[in-house]
Every structure is written in C-alpha cells, then in structure tokens.
C-alpha cells in the first residue's frame, strides 16, 4: 500500500461544504444562463459567441484553430464542428496558415464581426445583471482575485481575457 493510499481523504468540513455547494451550483447554473441569453438574443451558443469574440480581438481577426480551441477551452474536434457551423453562416473562414502550412487559421469575416458587435450588448447586460449588479466594487475585486488564483491552478497561463473575450465595448 502506498503512502498516498494509506492517507485518509481530506473530506470537506461543514463550513467548507456550506461554501462549496453554492459555488458548485453557480458553476452549473451560470453557463446555462449565459447560454440561454445568447441563444434567445443572438441565436448563438455561448461557446460560439466565445469563438467569434476571441477572433474579434485577435490581430487580423485570425487565430490558429489549435490556439482557438485552447482559448475557448474546447477540444479541436468540438471547435471544428462549431467553426463548420459558423462558416456555413458566413461568419468565419478557414485558411492555411501562411507562416506554417501544417496549421489552419480561423478568420472572422466582416459578417462575423457584425454578429459579434450585435451580440455583445446582450451578453454584457447578462453579465451585469447576473453577476456584477449583485456585488459591490470591493466584492467584485475580491471575486476577480479569487477567480484568477483558481484559474491559475487550472491553466498555468492564467489568461482570463482569452477565456472570456469581448465583454468590453467594441470600437
């Protein structure tokens, strides 16, 4: 028997459990609420919006598919299916990477840019009404600090902006 197997599990204390349960509920319900808003207002899934928004912030509105999958926290296979749907709507095109032909780039079209610009206000309002309006300025700063600390454990880059782009005003 290994030392790790001999150690007792680190069960949650009642206080930890009392804080974990609402956080777990938030982690389940918030994505669904954001997805519902995006579907209702823009006809996009939240994942599709994140893909379009990420491209809207990239230099030349272009990213490698592999980098886009990482940024959107999805598999390359899932991203490929989403990009195919977005291509069908004329919002994205795929092009061979000029720097390295082994890669494929996703490029946001002008119509895709217009879709992001049209979709962003509803998304921002949902973020405000569901999260920001419920917190004081100090609580929001504290939540941001906590989220960055946890995100760094999940993704060593800690790149929050890449994970949730375009929650700011568009030019």
Where are these predicted regions, by residue range?
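Hydrophobic alpha-helical core bundles mediating ligand binding, dimerization, or RNAP-core interactions
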Residues: 16, 20-38, 52, 116-135, ...
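C-terminal regulatory/oligomerization modules of transcriptional regulators
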Residues: 1-14, 137-171
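Short, hydrophobic-biased segments on the C-terminal half of alpha helices
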Residues: 65, 83-84
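Charged, amphipathic alpha-helical coiled-coil/dimerization segments
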Residues: 2-8, 84-142
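N-terminal helix-turn-helix DNA-binding core of bacterial DNA-binding proteins
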Residues: 32-75, 162
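N-terminal leader segment of winged-helix/HTH proteins
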Residues: 1-42, 89-91, 170-171
